[in-house]
């Protein structure tokens, strides 16, 4: 059974069909990419999947259950985590503390009680701290754990953001332009981290403009144009698709 099923998804803004009859599936263990130029509907699609927007029609099934119309936190608890194009670090917090925020969704004490350091939260807080530190080690940025997150290099902040998303223990990770703002070396490193995340059993769906990264790490690619799906295939086939080459990749 597919982990994520998108069926005839449609979202209108007045007379604009931002997402128009889009269908595809994401299988467990895949890295699947969604590409297209600005205005293609990629961000709107992610907002529909993660609960930030409600579709005008169509269905989204996650683990076999329909989730369209549910609140983002309800979808997150079910196992879907998301990162954003613009990195959102909590100012005044270290890299480790930023990751711990993501981990609190798995806790029972509640974020506020933990922030107030209530004694009965201490055992759980230690477990959250240990797990968050392990994620920083996994993504090879443990040496930055106690550094203010906003002072880190852009590529390091992206890794912290990935660790924070993984702290939620998702089965599906939505990555919104993970290479945005990164140089060629940082982009290659992010690609390596995404592949490592997939190898750990987390399915990945990403939106990305960097075609080299997409072609290198994706198992399948969905191509959008003005809100409609115009292609879905293996990277090698997408590279040979004449319509995709003409509209998106350049001849």
How would you describe each model-predicted region?
Residues 1-251:
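Glycine-rich phosphate-binding loops of nucleotide-dependent enzymes
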């Amino acid at each position: 059974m597919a982990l994520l099923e998108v069926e005839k998804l449609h979202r209108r803004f007045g007379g604009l069909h931002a997402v128009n009859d889009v269908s595809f599936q994401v299988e467990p263990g895949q890295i699947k990419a969604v590409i297209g130029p600005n205005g293609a509907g990629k961000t709107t699609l992610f907002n529909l999947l993660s609960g930030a927007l409600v579709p005008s029609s169509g269905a989204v099934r996650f683990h076999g259950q329909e989730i369209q119309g549910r609140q983002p936190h309800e979808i997150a608890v079910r196992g879907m985590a998301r990162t954003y194009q613009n990195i959102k670090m909590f100012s005044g917090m270290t890299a480790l503390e930023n990751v711990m925020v993501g981990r609190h969704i798995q806790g029972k004490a509640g974020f506020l009680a933990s922030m107030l350091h209530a004694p009965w939260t201490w055992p759980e807080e230690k477990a959250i701290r240990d797990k968050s530190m392990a994620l920083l080690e996994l993504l090879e940025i443990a040496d930055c754990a106690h550094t203010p997150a906003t002072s880190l290099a852009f590529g390091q902040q992206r890794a912290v953001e990935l660790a924070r998303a993984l702290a939620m223990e998702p089965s599906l990770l939505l990555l919104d332009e993970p290479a945005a703002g990164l140089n060629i070396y940082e982009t290659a490193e992010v690609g390596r981290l995404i592949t490592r995340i997939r190898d750990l059993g987390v399915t990945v769906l990403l939106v990305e403009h960097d075609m080299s990264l997409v072609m290198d790490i994706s198992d399948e690619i969905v191509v959008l144009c003005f809100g409609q799906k115009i292609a879905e295939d293996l990277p090698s086939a997408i590279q040979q698709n004449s319509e995709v080459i003409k509209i998106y990749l350049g001849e």
